[in-house]
Structures are given as C-alpha cells and as structure tokens.
Design a protein with these regions (language model features):
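Peripheral interaction segments used for macromolecular assembly
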Residues: 1-174
Length: 174
C-alpha cells in the first residue's frame, strides 16, 4: 500500500504489549543510496528523548499509528553503529532539485509515495516552475527512472529521450 510523505510524519507509535502510545514518530529516516525508509526519528512519550525506530521492528501500520511489540524496540541513536552515517546525513527528499541526464531542470520534489510493505519510495512528485505549470502541471517520477541521487539534486532519465527497442535494433530500424 502506497502512503504519501505527509502521512509518514508525526505518527503515534503504539505498543502491542501495553496497548498505549509509547512514542511519536516525527519523521522518516531515508537512505539516499536506495530510497528506502530505514526507520523513524521518534520522541519518547515519557522522557521526551530522541530515539530511533527501525523499520524491521514495525509489526503493522494501523490507523492509530505504527504498531510495535514493546518499548524495547526503540533505540538510542548512538547504539545504531551501522546506521550512524545515514542518521547523520539527515537526508530529506522534499525540496531537492530534480534534473534530467541532459541537464534540463524539471523542478523540486514536493511529495513522495512509499510502499509500506517494503518501505521503498516508489514515486516522486515534482512541482515545476510557474511558467511550466501552466502547460504541464505536476510531474510523477517512478523510482526506475532515477539515475543518481546526491544531497542537493536527483538526476532522472530524460522522458523525451528516444530509446531503441531491441527488436528495432535487430531489424536495423533507426
């Protein structure tokens, strides 16, 4: 099931053991190498400390929020050595410029949709400049079109670029 970015922030974290809220998931931790949500920055309900909830510890996404087994699944950021680099990047997708491989500027990421069964970001929604909005509107980019991601821009395959099909190559058609 795809979820938009605004529905992935400020979520209650519910404990299945106690049946109550144990934390609030403030914003997702996005891995820019594979566009996967690796976890969430959380605010502890009791001590108000910042903790990390890993995606592997989420049992289900219910209307009340994110369901986890117990409070023990929340980790202190310093304990997550393998994720330290990703956590320190604090990569945020919204607002990043999107250009094509031919250096044509498409706009900026205004929203994204993530598949909550795999935690991969599937679609990027690009808001275009005003002069392009009148004729084109909002662009949707699938994750398969992405070539490269850097902290300040995303490079995608140009949609106007003609790709020769393998059948056309065999027949000698240009």
């Amino acid at each position: 099931m795809l979820q938009l970015a605004n529905s992935l922030s400020d979520l209650p974290v519910m404990s299945l053991r106690t049946g109550g809220m144990i934390a609030r998931a403030e914003k997702p931790i996005i891995n820019p190498n594979n566009l996967k949500i690796d976890g969430w920055f959380c605010r502890d309900q009791f001590s108000k400390n910042q903790l990390i909830l890993l995606n592997k510890d989420i049992r289900d996404m219910v209307p009340q929020g994110l369901a986890v087994d117990d409070y023990d699944v929340l980790s202190v950021p310093e304990d997550l050595i393998r994720m330290k680099e990703i956590i320190n990047l604090n990569f945020q997708l919204i607002g990043i410029s999107v250009i094509t491989n031919n250096h044509r500027k498409l706009g900026k990421v205004s929203d994204y949709a993530a598949n909550m069964s795999s935690f991969y970001i599937q679609k990027l929604y690009i808001s275009q400049p005003v002069y392009r909005t009148l004729s084109g509107g909002q662009l949707n980019i699938d994750r398969t079109q992405i070539i490269e991601i850097s902290p300040d821009q995303i490079i995608v395959r140009d949609v106007d670029e003609k790709v020769r099909s393998p059948a056309a190559a065999l027949l000698g058609i240009r």
